[in-house]
Amino acid sequence: MAKGKEKSVFFCQECGYESAKWLGKCPGCGQWNTFVEELVTKQSGDAARLMPSSEPMTLQEIYYDDVLRIDTGIHELNRVLGGGMVPGALMLLAGDPGIGKSTLTMQLTGSIHMQEKILYVSGEESRQQLKMRAQRLGIGTEQLYILTENNLSVIEKHIDKIKPGLLILDSIQTVYLPEITSAPGSVSQLRECTGKLLQWAKGLGLSVIVVGHVTKDGAVAGPRVLEHMVDTVLFFEGERHNHFRILRALKNRFGSTNEIGVFEMQEQGLREVHNPSEVFLSERPQDTVGSVVVPCMEGTRPVLVELQALVASSPYGQPRRMTNGADYNRTAMLLAVLEKKMRLPIGNHDIFLNVVGGLKVDEPAIDLGIIAALVSSMQNRPILKDAVVLGEVGLTGEVRTINFLEKRLIEAEKMGFRVAVVPAGNLKQGQKFPIEVKGVRNVGEALRVLLGGA
């Protein structure tokens, strides 16, 4: 076999764009100073072998079993995945350091309903450290095999020997292929290692979960092609000093990307939170100025969240604007609506907006709730008692209709709320709701109902 030739190539660390020379600005993603030099080996002859080919088949000839999904034993994870794990799927689990990625994957090994063996490969921890975590989480299954290895070729030999049904790799940034001369974690290694894992998943029907690091900006570390190659991208998020964790699907070929799973970090590991609304509102004081409850939709699940606003006179020439959990640009737009349409001199005030519990909400249905919290804080007047607020606000101050109103109100009724201020366009003649509903057409009407006691 002819020996491969080495050549120097420059890769963009953000998107994986390849160039023969160094470039200041990447033509692929537009980022500056992201190119690094790597040595790659160009294979010749039949060295670059492809995956085994298959014969073309018609749709009628392809066998498909809808109940083929594997129950992970973790209800919140099943929800995010779309009903369970699909055999042969390659999944990427990313999140900040210390957020609980390794804890979640280790708990999965003890709860999953699977007869096949499970191979847990770690390139970051020793066998003793992994056993300590397993004992702390109460995991003692005989199906679980632990391997500490960074060489993907060695890992392949153990897969051929053990023949597992599930492979967990922690993490993709620490493994390497020996035929690639660049260091582990480089663009070339990440791309080639992911390609190898994809070959195993599709060729062997092996479910693969890969743990990935994130950058300081919160994006998945490595080239963008990494996210394109996998079937599912899961993101585990939460505040470092907050014990709640949110699992989201940023990409899912086998289900929705709008669902979330809620967990609580405890000494014994991650505990599922089946009723997030109760958790997020558990410490909410009654009749508090600047606080409002909004029923949000996370996929098909209604979740009640508390919005808190603090409006104070600014001692500086340039007022401060800070948001946590809500979209900054949308909040700025709503402030402009208040200034223009309601004649409120809010522009010279410091504005602080927070979604309690570390949840990130980006749907327009919280617009009216944001406005209500801001005006309540500015005028030092509490919101209407036992009320929830929802509605999208337009640039002219009108309150627009929203989706899934009945689901949101049913959740509000479960949590003891008795009144809902909603868009008038959502109300139909003769329609019944579980709680009292007040329809409003614009921001002025909504504020009179919420702050005037009407």
Residue ranges and their predicted role:
Residues 3-14, 18-79, 86-92, 99-110, ...:
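Peripheral, non-AAA+ core regions of ATP-driven protein-machinery
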Residues 118-122:
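Conserved RecA-like ASCE P-loop NTPase motor core of nucleic-acid helicases/translocases
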Residues 147:
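Conserved SAM-binding strand-loop segment of SAM-dependent methyltransferases
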Residues 127:
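Divalent metal-dependent catalytic cores for phosphoryl transfer on phosphate-bearing substrates
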